[in-house]
Structure formats: C-alpha cells, structure tokens
C-alpha cells in the first residue's frame, strides 16, 4: 500500500487531517452535595416507595430543587445501599449489622413546641435608657404576645428548620413588634 505525504494517520504526521477534531477532554461532573432537608425528603420518599415512578420523581425533584436525574440516581444508590444492608443482616444470622438511627420525621410545616430557658441577663427589666425599648429581650408587654416557640432553637434534632417555618417565625415576630411598639 502506498501512502502519499500527509495522507497518513494523524499520529504519524503529528497534525490533524482535514475534517478531524482534536480529542475533547471528557467532562466529569462534580459530586452532588445534598442539604439536610433534601436528604430528609428523599429518605421519606424512599420509605414510601423504593421504586417511585417518573411522575413521583419529578414532583420530588421540584420540591427539593434538584434535577430529576439526580433524584433518579439517588434512588439507584439508595436501593443499592438497602440491598447491601439486607444482605448483611440476613447473612449474619442473629447478630445484625449495626445501623445508624434513621432520621426522625420532623414537622417542617410548624415550628417546634419546645422553648429555651432565658438566661438571667436576657430577661425583662428596665430599659438601659429611659424611653427606649430594651433590645436584649422582650419587654413585659411582648412576653405574652410571643407564642410558645418564640425562643425555640434554630435546630431541632440536628435538622435546620425549613425556610417556611423560619418565615413564619419572622412574620410572627414582626407582628408582635408592631403590636408592642407602634410607630410614633
């Protein structure tokens, strides 16, 4: 076989022939980091169904602000983890493999009912400057206007409160301030 100069494979001549493109660097996706809220919602959906249909996955993806393909891959990985745990538990006989406790179901729609005790220096008292409201704690008039969750922690059992709950707390706080200190 006879080759004319420049008609050989690209590796021989060191250059690219007409119509050939340089090999593209393969794009590698970064690992997805899920928020606590996303993981909680995904785990709840997994408890309901290990094989959700595409409609359910799309709904869940919209709810947790993830692409549907990320939700689909999460379910594939979660099923693999579940099968691995099942094998370990059934293969070990009476001694089951130690498992981490499941995440508790948190009532994200409403704030927690528990309240934190106030430190003595945060309690109600006379204002530092007469005529100005005390800024480090609720005054006597505000105490009753706050609900039972007024001084609730921002974390419940290690989970951050959902954005809607925080907005509700902020709205209630603003309303309480409006009732206690009307603009002059």
Swiss-Prot record:
CC terms in the record's Gene Ontology section? nucleus
Q: Which GO terms describe its molecular function?
A: DNA-binding transcription factor activity, RNA polymerase II-specific; RNA polymerase II cis-regulatory region sequence-specific DNA binding
Q: Disulfide bonds, which pairs?
A: none
Report the locations given in the UniProt record. Answer: Nucleus
- What residue spans carry the region label Disordered? 1-31
Alphabetically sorted, this entry's keywords are: DNA-binding, Homeobox, Nucleus, Sensory transduction, Transcription, Transcription regulation, Vision
Gene Ontology biological process terms in this record: positive regulation of transcription by RNA polymerase II; visual perception
Chief subcellular location equals: nucleus
Q: According to the UniProt entry, which residue ranges have a biased composition of type Low complexity?
A: 1-10
At which residues is the DNA-binding region annotated?
27-86
User: At the top level of its lineage, which domain of life is listed?
Assistant: Eukaryota
Q: PROSITE patterns, alphabetically?
A: HOMEOBOX_1 (PS00027), HOMEOBOX_2 (PS50071)
Provide the domain comment: The Homeobox transactivates the Ret-1 element in the presence of CRX and NRL.
Q: What is its biological role?
A: May be involved in modulating the expression of photoreceptor specific genes. Binds to the Ret-1 and Bat-1 element within the rhodopsin promoter.
Subunit record text: Interacts with CRX.
Q: What is this protein called?
A: Retina and anterior neural fold homeobox protein 2
């Amino acid at each position: 076989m006879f080759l004319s100069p420049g008609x050989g494979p690209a590796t021989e001549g060191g250059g690219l022939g007409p119509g050939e493109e340089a090999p593209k660097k393969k794009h590698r996706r970064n690992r997805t980091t899920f928020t606590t809220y996303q993981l909680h919602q995904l785990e709840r959906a997994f408890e309901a169904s290990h094989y959700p249909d595409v409609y359910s996955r799309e709904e869940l993806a919209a709810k947790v602000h993830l692409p549907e393909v990320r939700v689909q891959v999460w379910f594939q990985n979660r099923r693999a983890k579940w099968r691995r745990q099942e094998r370990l538990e059934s293969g070990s006989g009476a001694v089951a493999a130690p498992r981490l406790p499941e995440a508790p179901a948190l009532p994200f729609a409403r704030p927690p009912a528990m309240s934190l005790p106030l430190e003595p220096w945060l309690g109600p008292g006379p204002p530092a400057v007469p005529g100005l409201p005390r800024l480090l704690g609720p005054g006597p008039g505000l105490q009753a206007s706050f609900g039972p969750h007024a001084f609730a922690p921002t974390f419940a059992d290690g989970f951050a409160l959902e954005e809607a709950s925080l907005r509700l707390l902020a709205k209630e706080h603003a309303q309480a301030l409006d009732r206690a200190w009307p603009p002059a």
